[in-house]
């Protein structure tokens, strides 16, 4: 989201439905740069872990995630600039991609339960591109599985990208002076956001405080995870109907 820091933290607390193990937040300000915090949530609730840290978060843009897989956000310094990234991903060829990146003299600094952190792997694929869009398209090209993501950049904007087959949702919400991107629109009514629209498969947008810029148009194919139709219990998409 792009909003005051208290709003970033409070808003994030309404989006903890699809994960239970780890929670992470990252904000950006010109004064202090990126600030990140990650906690284990297996024995407690999201709010109790982060409420004592509110004062350390600065800036009016932030991203966060509740994950059952990787410790995230990951913060990367690259030729594209510094950025923080969170992903909702399931990569079936992760070992193959790991070996390929290691053969290119890449290295992995973040491990999750002694395994490669797939969010870091995705970030390494992104920085192989000349731009963020080219890098995200590189992710789509190489992974087998699915990946939706949010990137928080040094200009305070947020890049949102939906999985190229639309398997997991990304919805944009708006209010008077803020935009938000999330996987679950159920949080918006409590926070006075209105649904702006759902991203299409493979669509990439950039969120600012007062507008959204489309960076990549959506594709034609849609292979939504059928579980989500039951999980959310509502009509989620106005884009093309699911198909095999």
Name each model-derived stretch.
Residues 2-6, 10-200, 206-239:
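Conserved short alpha-helical segments that host acidic/polar catalytic motifs at enzyme active sites
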Residues 240-244:
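A short, hydrophobic C-terminal helix/tail in secreted or cell-surface proteins
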């Amino acid at each position: 989201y792009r909003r005051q820091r208290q709003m970033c933290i409070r808003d994030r607390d309404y989006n903890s439905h699809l994960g239970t193990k780890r929670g992470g937040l990252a904000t950006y300000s010109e004064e202090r740069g990126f600030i990140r915090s990650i906690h284990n949530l297996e024995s407690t609730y999201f709010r109790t872990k982060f409420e004592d840290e509110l004062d350390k978060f600065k800036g009016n843009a932030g991203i966060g995630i509740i994950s059952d897989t990787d410790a995230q956000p990951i913060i990367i310094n690259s030729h594209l600039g510094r950025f923080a990234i969170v992903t909702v991903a399931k990569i079936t060829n992760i070992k193959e991609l790991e070996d390929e990146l290691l053969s290119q003299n890449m290295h992995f600094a973040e491990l999750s339960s002694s395994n490669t952190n797939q969010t870091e792997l995705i970030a390494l694929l992104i920085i192989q591109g000349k731009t963020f869009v080219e890098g995200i398209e590189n992710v789509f090209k190489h992974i087998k599985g699915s990946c939706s993501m949010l990137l928080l950049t040094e200009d305070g904007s947020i890049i949102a990208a939906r999985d190229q087959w639309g398997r997991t949702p990304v919805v944009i919400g708006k209010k008077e002076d803020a935009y938000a991107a999330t996987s679950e629109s159920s949080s918006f009514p409590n926070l006075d956001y209105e649904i702006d629209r759902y991203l299409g498969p493979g669509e990439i947008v950039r969120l600012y405080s007062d507008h959204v810029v489309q960076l990549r148009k959506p594709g034609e194919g849609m292979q939504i995870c059928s579980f989500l139709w039951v999980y959310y219990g509502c009509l989620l998409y106005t884009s093309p109907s699911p198909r095999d």
